[in-house]
Structures are given as C-alpha cells and as structure tokens.
C-alpha cells in the first residue's frame, strides 16, 4: 500500500462512520476568497480544469447518419442491450449532475476545484443530452422511448443500479467517502457498458454511437482522475484501506450483476466471465490510482481495449488537444496517475 502523504491521517473506523469535521480538511475550510480564481493557489487542480476545458465538444459534432442502417441489421438481443445501456446512461448522468450541484460544489471551498466541478457539470449535461438524442434517434415507438428515458423509475435492473449513487448524494458520510463513492460510479459503474460499446466499434457497427462513447468515456476518465488527484494530494484524513475496499468491492459487485446477469453482455456476443474479469481489472486500476494496492489482481482480458485510451488518443482529440497546446492551455500538463479503463499497470 502506498504510504499516506506527509501530514495525512488515516481515520479509525468509528470516525469514518460518523464522518469528519469538514473544517479539518483544507479543501473544505471556509475561504473568504473563494469567489475569485486568481491568484491560483492549487496549480495541479487548475491544470486539471484546463485539461477538461480543452476537451469540450457538443452533440452536434456526432454524425448519426449511418447508425440507422446498422440498427436495422442488429438482432433483437443486440438492440435490447444497446437500448438498456443508453437508458442507464441517460439517467445516471442526471444523478452525477445532482451530486455536483447539491453536494460537491458546496463541499469544496477552493475556487480551482469549484471551477472543475462547474465545468464537469456542464459536460455531464452534454453527456445526458447525447444519450437522450441517441434514444430519440434509434427508438421510433413513443411509448417505448418514454419508458427508456424514465428507466430509473420503470426498469428494475436500472433502478437497482441507480439506487447506489443516489444514496451517496443523501449520505451524511464524510466528503472523502463520498468522493471515492462517486469515483467508483464514474470509474466502475460505467466501465462494463463503455467496454461493451467499444466491442461494437471493433465489429465496425454504429459509428455515431461508438464515437460518442469515445468522447464520453474519455471525459469520465478525466473526472475519475480528478477525484484521485483530490484524494491523493489534497485530502488530509485518508480512509482506512478496509473502508476504501468496502466501497470499491460494493461497486464491483453491483456492476458485475448488472452487465453480466441483469443485462447480459452475451446479448451482443461477449463473454460474461471475461467481462466480470475486466470489471475487476478496472477496479484494481482505480485502487492503484487512489494509492492502494490491487485487490483482485485480474488481468486485462480484452485485446481490443488495449487500443482504447481515455487520455485522448483518438484522432478527434489529438487534433483538439494539439490546438490548445499551441495556445499554451495544456503545455505543462503531466501524465502521472491517469485513470484508464484499458491500460495495464
């Protein structure tokens, strides 16, 4: 296990259960200068904000013109899987937005972190709009479309999965626990579905859907990176490894049940056992990014995911990031502690 940073304190279990005094955490201390960004005090947080800013995109940049041809060639199981993945994503982004608006934006008093969360909230709105547009495009029956858009209330397996992050929003747990909870949401809860959509890309299907998946998975990787940055570098009171594991393992179990049983990936021709292994691999990657040792020690089972990177390796982002680097926006951005759904470690 990585040593706790200097000045950090690992919380005893009883204090974890009760939460901690927010005033003890630098990120949460009252800050009379929080309404003004400059002078920048937290340069690493600011760099993450600028990195996120350089990755902005809109729904209008996604071409769905060829998707309907592929949609017509899919079998019923494949269409069922895609519909329900999109239905989950459409609602889950709204949950992340609510957490940002109700909790994280008021939890932190550091303007650089608030800037990141504010921009993340906007990007989550773009993700939510994207999934809604995809459903609106693919589903012609208005009644089915409404059922899928309201999946958190109408589809039991999606409702069950959504309950976990919703509980974190209303939780009295400390900020560091909720921070890891939502890192698990964006880093683990989305991983199986992202991977399944990349599988469609490998098969040469649904170019609009799979391109949007590249953009959104990249964003979510950056959001997970940011949570790890805050936890590793700016949280004074670390959680015990046992508590971190409890949160991560719980998220893995829920994701594994969802993508392997409730909405089985075999519907699109994927192996459920390998998908379960992949989710464990991703969870270990998140644990390492949080400064902990691996728990599952599972290896990356999908060769096609080796070609996928959430740090902007697509042509779209090579172009976008390059333009901003010329302007100096990201010229000093480092590459350490990046969270990925594909890279081994």
From Swiss-Prot:
Amino acids binding Fe cation 2: 124, 186, 220, 223
Keyword set, alphabetical order: Deoxyribonucleotide synthesis, Iron, Metal-binding, Oxidoreductase
SS bond list: none
Catalytic residues of the enzyme: 131
Domain of life of the organism encoding this protein: Eukaryota
Any one GO biological process: deoxyribonucleotide biosynthetic process
Required co-factors: Fe cation
PROSITE patterns on file: RIBORED_SMALL (PS00368)
Cross-referenced Gene3D superfamilies: Ribonucleotide Reductase, subunit A (1.10.620.20)
Keyword Iron part of the UniProt annotation: yes
InterPro entries hit by this protein: Ferritin-like_SF, RNR-like, RNR_small, RNR_small_AS, RNR_small_fam
MF term (GO), any: metal ion binding
Binding site for Fe cation 1: 93, 124, 127
Catalytic activity: a 2'-deoxyribonucleoside 5'-diphosphate + [thioredoxin]-disulfide + H2O = a ribonucleoside 5'-diphosphate + [thioredoxin]-dithiol
Pfam families in UniProt: Ribonuc_red_sm
Broad enzyme group: oxidoreductase
EC assignment: 1.17.4.1
PANTHER family: RIBONUCLEOSIDE-DIPHOSPHATE REDUCTASE SMALL CHAIN, RIBONUCLEOSIDE-DIPHOSPHATE REDUCTASE SUBUNIT M2
Quaternary assembly: Heterodimer of a large and a small subunit.
Protein function: Provides the precursors necessary for DNA synthesis. Catalyzes the biosynthesis of deoxyribonucleotides from the corresponding ribonucleotides.
Family stated for the protein in its record: Belongs to the ribonucleoside diphosphate reductase small chain family.
Name this protein carries in UniProt: Ribonucleoside-diphosphate reductase small subunit
């Amino acid at each position: 296990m990585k040593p706790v940073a200097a000045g950090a304190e690992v919380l005893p279990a009883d204090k974890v259960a009760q939460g901690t005094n927010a005033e003890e955490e630098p990120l949460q201390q009252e800050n009379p200068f929080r309404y003004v960004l400059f002078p920048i005090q937290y340069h690493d947080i600011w760099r993450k904000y600028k990195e996120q800013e350089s990755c902005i995109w809109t729904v209008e940049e996604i071409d769905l013109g060829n998707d309907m041809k592929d949609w017509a060639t899919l079998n019923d199981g494949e269409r069922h899987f895609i519909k329900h993945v999109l239905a989950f994503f459409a609602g889950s982004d709204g949950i992340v937005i609510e957490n940002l608006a109700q909790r994280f934006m008021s939890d932190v008093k550091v303007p650089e972190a608030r800037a990141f969360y504010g921009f993340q909230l906007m990007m989550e709105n773009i993700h939510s709009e994207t999934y809604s547009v995809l459903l609106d495009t693919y589903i012609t029956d208005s009644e089915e479309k409404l059922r899928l858009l309201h999946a958190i209330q109408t589809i039991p397996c999606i409702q069950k999965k959504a309950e976990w992050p919703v509980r974190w929003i209303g939780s009295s747990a400390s900020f560091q626990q909720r921070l890891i909870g939502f890192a698990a949401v964006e880093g683990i809860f989305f991983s199986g579905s992202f991977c399944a959509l990349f599988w469609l890309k490998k098969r040469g299907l649904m170019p609009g859907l799979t391109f949007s998946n590249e953009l959104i998975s990249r964003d979510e990787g950056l959001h997970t990176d940011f949570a790890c940055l805050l936890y590793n570098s700016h949280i004074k009171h670390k959680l015990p490894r046992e508590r971190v594991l409890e949160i991560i393992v719980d998220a893995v179990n829920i994701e594994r049940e969802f993508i392997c049983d409730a909405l089985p990936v075999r519907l699109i021709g994927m192996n459920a056992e390998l998908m379960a292994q992949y989710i464990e691999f991703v969870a270990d990657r998140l644990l390492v990014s949080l400064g902990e040792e691996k728990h599952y020690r599972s290896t990356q089972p999908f060769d096609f995911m080796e070609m996928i990177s959430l740090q902007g390796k697509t042509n779209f982002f090579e172009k976008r990031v390059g333009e901003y680097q010329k302007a100096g926006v990201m010229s000093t951005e480092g590459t350490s502690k990046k969270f990925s759904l594909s890279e081994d470690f």
